[in-house]
């Protein structure tokens, strides 16, 4: 079986007999029921391949669809002129970079359909070439845009250039409304929705199917699709890792499944990671390794975000679908980028419960954040395995000595809320070690800062900033934080830690 890793061209995939999860029923449904669509999905989730599938369909290439769902659904197989804009590969961090890319597309189309000197702007040229294409071919045109938001995402740190990109895109896309009579179908994709309102404000008939129940599995794959299409590969993966087929499916599910794009829907597997795992026969963080979420980290720092909240974030429909909210809330972009997903829904308060979709994303994201809190590297005193041994063995003194060295080695400059920084750092340490960790756990008499559980020990940790370790330990006792574990057979260890905002490290610690 040939796995289409990196293959984003539908014709290439079909003619070279790569494995394909049939999504053509969605192609027919979209073309049959509507005209203008927008789809938001994380990167490497199959958006480009789906656009290419649409392109082949509107080119009337019936032979490519033999054996697929749409083959007998469609009767006409007409050919339409297609304007396919791919913004995924270009660099938009320089002035005029977006203009250059759009100009290149227009120049190529004008060679085929003609140009006019009076069309002085990108928008006017686009408007003119659409009309001439429709007149020349005798039919309406199809417009496909891949990664509409790439110019906006790449200029988060340059508001002036981002505003320039937005203005150009808004004028360019406004043509889709003014030239409606010449357009048969339009489909636009992106990672995020922010900017959609300002960029597409003139295109008020754009249907957003990102959270539409009918299109949840339009990209990616369900467990049923995984098992039905890749049974041979699953068996090979099981044999290579000494597991049964059932255990292998469970491992794939835990590591790569878990994306939910609407409440009460089945999970969707990350196709890129699944295909790489079946090819290389090893479970690794393939999706995460292809792109580091630098802009998301910048957002978290900008908003002084509490990392523990990422596993219990609650958000309304308006929030996770909001746009242009970077200045007030990082959650919409983090969700839309695929680092958070819908884990549940509170019917009473109409709130989505968000969290990491799977192990790949959680472990990858937390490990990516670690260098922000320590000079982590091969020579760093922060060695996860040593921390794990200390905590599992019930050696808090050793653990605290390593923790002190961990902060002492840190070159990161604490900005803003120092207490938040230390809390985030401790949370990262314990989560990366793989321990059950809760932060600010409510009790009958207050909130304990950090609770860590292993098979043999329960650690109750109270932290103070510019206070004293004794004060922290006293709070554990006075608030009776250990009471809920009185009947637990595990040993309870109480730790009081005092951090210094001046030295940016552990000033003192005390065991109880």
Annotate each language-model stretch with its function:
Residues 1-418:
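Phosphate-binding site recognition
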Residues 132-137, 429-455:
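Active-site metal-binding core of divalent-cation-utilizing nuclease and nuclease-like domains
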Residues 142, 457-459, 493:
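Structural motif
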Residues 405-438:
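Acidic-basic catalytic patches of nuclease active cores, encompassing PD-(D/E)XK
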Residues 484, 488-512:
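Domain-level recognition of nuclease-like catalytic cores that cleave nucleotide substrates
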